[in-house]
From Swiss-Prot:
Encoding gene (name): FIB
Keyword Transcription: no
Modification type Asymmetric dimethylarginine: residues: R27, R47, R61
UniProt EC number: 2.1.1.-
Posttranslational modification: By homology to other fibrillarins, some or all of the N-terminal domain arginines are modified to asymmetric dimethylarginine (DMA).
GO cellular component assignments: box C/D methylation guide snoRNP complex; nucleolus; small-subunit processome
Protein name (record): rRNA 2'-O-methyltransferase fibrillarin
Native organism: Tetrahymena thermophila
Family: Belongs to the methyltransferase superfamily. Fibrillarin family.
Organismal lineage: Eukaryota, Sar, Alveolata, Ciliophora, Intramacronucleata
Region (Disordered): 1-62
PANTHER family: FIBRILLARIN, RRNA 2-O-METHYLTRANSFERASE FIBRILLARIN
Name of one Pfam family that matches: Fibrillarin
Amino acid sequence: MGKDFKSGGGNAGGKPFNKGPGGPGGRPFNKGPGGPGGPGGKFGGGRPGGPGGKFGAKGPRGPKTIIVKHRLEGVFICKGQQEALVTKNFFPGESVYNEKRMSVEENGEKIEYRVWNPYRSKIAAAVVGGISDIHIKPGSKVLYLGGASGTTVSHVADIVGPTGVVYAVEFSHRSGRDLVNMAKKRTNVVPIIGDARKPQEYRFLVGMVDVVFADVAQPDQARIMGMNCQYFLKNGGHFLISIKACCIDSTNEPAVVFAAEVQKLKEEGLKPEQQLTLEPYERDHAMVLGSYRA
């Protein structure tokens, strides 16, 4: 359930994408029927059915893939055999983490999109769950704390596009290598191998940003967010923070932990405006959205 700090109203939790059906079997001409389709995957159809007999006709084709705009700018929904959240691929022809891609012809030009899996991305989970806004859109400048290997960073880069920039900070050198490799082709990503607790060490690399997102899973993450906002977030800018309850306090109920973290964010000079749980995609996680010096 979501929680709106302004009105007290909640946002309904998002429904997980349904598993798609397997592919149909082939239609026989002289011989027996083709094999049944495989089971559906997390985001849609499984393997197609087996072919018909020697002279068998092909099975019917699935529904045409259609891309429609999501209410959040720069985010899209793929409608076809299954429904999925997608972003427009900044570097067509290549996946980042073996995610599914699809091409759609738009105004005589083929545009490639990538599936944005809410089980692999907390921002995607928040979008599917009904968050009011993420304030990340084409042209945005984003500071991403806890970039890991770049799974979600790559989708944020898709959204902000060539006129935006994503400064991605990651402490782990192992994950950082993957992040750096991803950024070689996504030129709007600036990878920074550093400690998010020490923003002064990368202040010469990062400009003022529109949004700060943090997914650092540390007990002092509210303080980490506060420091980075003071250094880099524009007045009137926005922040998003993913809170993993057990990383803060494993002895308390998640709701109690979330409430305490919201209070800490307020003490850092931030203004929390909405809280959203990330079930069923992430257990005991919440996303908090807010503004800074608005």
